[in-house]
């Protein structure tokens, strides 16, 4: 085998048949041969692979477009739901504000009525206490006046004057009957 290499090297030195040790030239020639063989024998095989790949890519694109349309539809639906929810929230807020105002007015009216009722009750209680106090004062004054009159009558009237007073009082009562 060593002999073959020696012969090939000698032949290459004479520019004849032999091994070409220039790798760049050799690789280009080999690459050209490989491409020619592939183009001749493998167009159906490569075409089949490329068409399958193309079909796969087209299917992926269709699926992506379909998902995009579904997403757009879902987005539109969700935006509509959001708009409806916002409108409903605004209605609820307006209703709550209206109810709050109504409750506030009722509470204020009830408070005013309670204040008036308390004032009336206080005035009635004061009038009642005033009437009681006046009645007590009259009773006390009447008792004191009677006590004073009795004491004055006992001091100023003797028995004879008392008898004349009783007789005149009986006479007046007898005339009225």
Swiss-Prot record:
Predominant location: membrane
Gene Ontology CC: one annotated term: proton-transporting ATP synthase complex
Matches recorded under InterPro entries: ATP_synth_B-like_membr_sf, ATP_synth_b/b'su_bac/chlpt, ATP_synth_F0_bsu_bac
Record key words, sorted: ATP synthesis, CF(0), Hydrogen ion transport, Ion transport, Membrane, Thylakoid, Transmembrane, Transmembrane helix, Transport
Spans through the membrane: 27-47
Domain of life: Bacteria
GO molecular function, one term: proton-transporting ATP synthase activity, rotational mechanism
Xref: SUPFAM superfamilies: F1F0 ATP synthase subunit B, membrane domain (SSF81573)
Cellular compartment(s): Cellular thylakoid membrane
Membrane topology recorded in Swiss-Prot or TrEMBL: Single-pass membrane protein
Similarity remark: Belongs to the ATPase B chain family.
Functional description taken from the UniProt entry: F(1)F(0) ATP synthase produces ATP from ADP in the presence of a proton or sodium gradient. F-type ATPases consist of two structural domains, F(1) containing the extramembraneous catalytic core and F(0) containing the membrane proton channel, linked together by a central stalk and a peripheral stalk. During catalysis, ATP synthesis in the catalytic domain of F(1) is coupled via a rotary mechanism of the central stalk subunits to proton translocation.
NCBIfam families reported in the protein's UniProt record: ATP_synt_b (TIGR01144), PRK07352.1 (NF005606)
Subunit composition and interactions: F-type ATPases have 2 components, F(1) - the catalytic core - and F(0) - the membrane proton channel. F(1) has five subunits: alpha(3), beta(3), gamma(1), delta(1), epsilon(1). F(0) has four main subunits: a(1), b(1), b'(1) and c(10-14). The alpha and beta chains form an alternating ring which encloses part of the gamma chain. F(1) is attached to F(0) by a central stalk formed by the gamma and epsilon chains, while a peripheral stalk is formed by the delta, b and b' chains.
UniProt protein name: ATP synthase subunit b
């Amino acid at each position: 085998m060593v002999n073959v290499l020696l012969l090939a090297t000698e032949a290459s030195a004479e520019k004849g048949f032999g091994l070409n040790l220039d790798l760049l030239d050799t690789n280009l020639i080999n690459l050209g041969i490989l491409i020619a063989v592939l183009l001749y024998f493998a167009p159906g095989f490569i075409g089949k692979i490329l068409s399958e790949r193309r079909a796969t890519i087209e299917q992926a694109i269709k699926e992506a477009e379909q998902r995009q349309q579904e997403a757009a539809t879902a987005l539109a639906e969700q935006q509509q739901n959001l708009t409806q929810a916002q409108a409903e929230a605004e209605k609820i807020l307006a209703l709550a504000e209206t109810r709050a105002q109504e409750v506030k007015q009722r509470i204020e009216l009830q408070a005013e009525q309670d204040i008036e009722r308390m004032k009336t009750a206080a005035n009635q209680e004061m009038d009642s206490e005033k009437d009681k106090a006046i009645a007590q004062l009259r009773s006390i004054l009447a008792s004191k006046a009677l006590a004073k009159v009795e004491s004055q009558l006992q001091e100023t009237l003797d028995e004879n004057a008392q008898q004349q007073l009783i007789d005149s009082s009986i006479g007046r009562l007898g005339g009225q009957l």
